[in-house]
Amino acid sequence: MKLRPLHDRVVIRRSEEETKTAGGIVLPGSAAEKPNQGEVVAVGTGKVLENGEVRPLAVKVGDKVVFGPYSGSNTVKVDGEDLLVMGENEILAVIEA
């Protein structure tokens, strides 16, 4: 199944959570923090402005992004994978290599 977000929504695949600390301590699943990074897997058509124009999104499929700890409260399961759906305004930055 494919998910197509509407308007200024973005679908993100969260990066894998760290299961080991920098010191080598293995964390149980409940103690590991969910990362605030992920890859954009789908984007909407853009934000509809008050004058009716559509402003395209600044992120694109494949971008690695950083988002806030409480962003993406809408989680959907697609083909057994949990994906986050959030507004573009919840994305803090794009990671450039």
UniProtKB/Swiss-Prot annotation:
GO terms for molecular function: ATP binding; metal ion binding; protein folding chaperone; protein-folding chaperone binding; unfolded protein binding. It holds the Pfam family Cpn10. The keyword Cytoplasm applies. It is found in: Cytoplasm. Keywords: Chaperone, Cytoplasm. Its main location: cytoplasm. One of its GO terms (cellular component) is cytoplasm. The keyword Lipoprotein does not apply. GO terms for biological process: chaperone cofactor-dependent protein refolding. InterPro entries: Chaperonin_GroES (IPR020818), Chaperonin_GroES_sf (IPR037124), Chaprnonin_Cpn10_CS (IPR018369), GroES-like_sf (IPR011032). It comes from the Bacteria. Belongs to the GroES chaperonin family. Heptamer of 7 subunits arranged in a ring. Interacts with the chaperonin GroEL. NCBIfam families: PRK00364.1-2 (NF001527), PRK00364.2-2 (NF001531), PRK00364.2-4 (NF001533). Together with the chaperonin GroEL, plays an essential role in assisting protein folding. The GroEL-GroES system forms a nano-cage that allows encapsulation of the non-native substrate proteins and provides a physical environment optimized to promote and accelerate protein folding. GroES binds to the apical surface of the GroEL ring, thereby capping the opening of the GroEL channel. This is Co-chaperonin GroES. It comes from Ectopseudomonas mendocina (strain ymp).
